[in-house]
Amino acid sequence: MTAWDGVLPFYPQPRHAASFSVPLLIVILVFLSLAASFLFILPGIRGHSRWFWLVRVLLSLFIGAEIVAVHFSGDWFVGRVWTNTSYKAFSPSRVQVHVGLHVGLAGVNITLRGTPRQQLNETIDYNERFTWRLNEDYTKEYVHALEKGLPDPVLYLAEKFTPSSPCGLYHQYHLAGHYAAATLWVAFCFWIIANALLSMPAPLYGGLALLTTGAFTLFGVFAFASISSVPLCHFRLGSAVLTPYYGASFWLTLATGILSLLLGGAVVILHYTRPSALRSFLDLSVKDCSNQAKGNSPLTLNNPQHEQLKSPDLNITTLL
């Protein structure tokens, strides 16, 4: 046993695959902290409104967390395959590996894991990310991967998404991810506005803001789905073909958009048909919401001059 437990500290260490996205983990922890804080104060809410608040807050946090989290997820378009393929360039050695392709809004993530992991006297476990954000150079990252001598399956898939590739995947995925991310951030802004309006005596406008949230969320899904119009290149890895498909983030965002539309539509419909039930669910007082529910409010003005002359009060009522 050496001083460093058998590790040579002055030489490059074995690669370790990243197990989770740090920004995604931060988003999940933030919204889980908000949910936990609300659950701590939930026993202080009296009566049946406690359960109304529970459903309302948890649904709202779920929608907000999902809209933010999918920006950092790489599961919008995924593909997995087990294959026997070459491992390094200029080498006849072949390995049995599991290859994963994960396309997100900001880039592509390629995983390579040996089955078993120990093959050719080394551990085969790679997780490489290539980004196409506005301030990132995908080609430069790909050239850097070539210089590092990454395995052939990783370089093969990464090359398919380069700007110079005849597949044309880079431009389509780059634009689709850019517009999808932009519309989802707009949806998140309307989600904040909807929560603010639903906490005030303005449930109608809160419902409209929630409808807008769902609309922009679906716009983001449709923007990313536009990639299906591009003929997909065949990803042939050794003896197998990798066939990508829409991943969990895509379907979860689609479900969130539909949920936002349903909730927003329910708020608008209840505002006109069952305003008392809507007030009970939102825990708003009758006095605060009566003016908006009726559509007009009486304004009564007393004339002080008639009181001085001891004449009957003159009430002026104006309907606004």
UniProtKB/Swiss-Prot annotation:
Alphabetical GO biological process terms: hydrogen peroxide metabolic process; positive regulation of cell motility; positive regulation of hydrogen peroxide biosynthetic process; protein maturation; protein transport; regulation of inflammatory response; regulation of thyroid hormone generation
UniProt KW 4Fe-4S keyword: no
PTM text: N-glycosylated.
Cytoplasmic side: 43-51, 205-206, 271-320
One of the record's GO cellular component terms: endoplasmic reticulum
Cited Pfam families: DuoxA (PF10204)
Glycan-linked positions: 84, 109, 121
Family: Belongs to the DUOXA family.
Protein name per the record: Dual oxidase maturation factor 2
Organism the protein comes from: Mus musculus
GN (gene name): Duoxa2
